[in-house]
Amino acid sequence: MSIASVWNIILIILGFGMLIGLHELGHFIAAKWAGIRTNAFAVGMGPVFLAWRGGIGLTFGASKTKVIEKFGKDASDMSDAELKEHGLSETEYSLRYLPIGGFVSMLGQEDGKPDSVSNDLRSYNMCPIGKRMVVVSAGVFMNLLLAAVLFIGCFQVGVRFEAPVIGQIIPNSPASETITTDGTHLQTGD
């Protein structure tokens, strides 16, 4: 495999990670706007590579073990008052090893248990349906916004394409009557 191929694969992975990160950021911003408690914001899947939580700081791996060591239970099990008392933020921001996805973990939205319900007023399921619709569609909105920004950027800067060049002229063809040498650049489509 050539270096160019490896570089292209790296660019694809970074681009995919950016797309997912912005998509999840849309859900995250909308959840915060709706007043929904967000326990985690992650880019990537699998084990945690780096994590940051207010009150704990940057950690290699999840901050959960440090929170439990320091306060006796996980931050996701603490009330808002307990988080404030301990100086912890409600959200753990993490970068994970596999750049194939991402997620926002909201209180009352358990993907593994779709029938789970939380009675907390800041949970996803207690949020009015209109706000939940905004939260669900915010990821798609961010993807559309990114597409618009990229298109505008491409049209402003421009994209260079190689000029069409005649490679070979077949003798006694209509082209041979008008074009005399190989390598001629086409100027118009006529």
Role assignments for model-derived ranges:
Residues 2-3, 61-88, 110-130, 142-190:
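PDZ peptide-recognition modules
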Residues 24-27, 132, 143:
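Acidic active-site catalytic centers that drive phospho-/nucleotidyl reactions
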Residues 93, 123, 131, 135, ...:
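Short gly/ser-rich anion-binding loops that grip negatively charged ligand groups
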Residues 13-17, 136, 140, 144, ...:
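Alpha-helical transmembrane spans of integral membrane proteins, capturing the lipid-embedded, hydrophobic core
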Residues 18, 22, 130, 138:
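Hydrophobic (often cysteine-bearing) scaffold residues that line and stabilize catalytic clefts
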Residues 1-9, 13, 129-133, 137:
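Hydrophobic, aromatic-rich alpha-helical transmembrane segments
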Residues 4-117:
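Small-residue-rich helix-interface/hinge motifs
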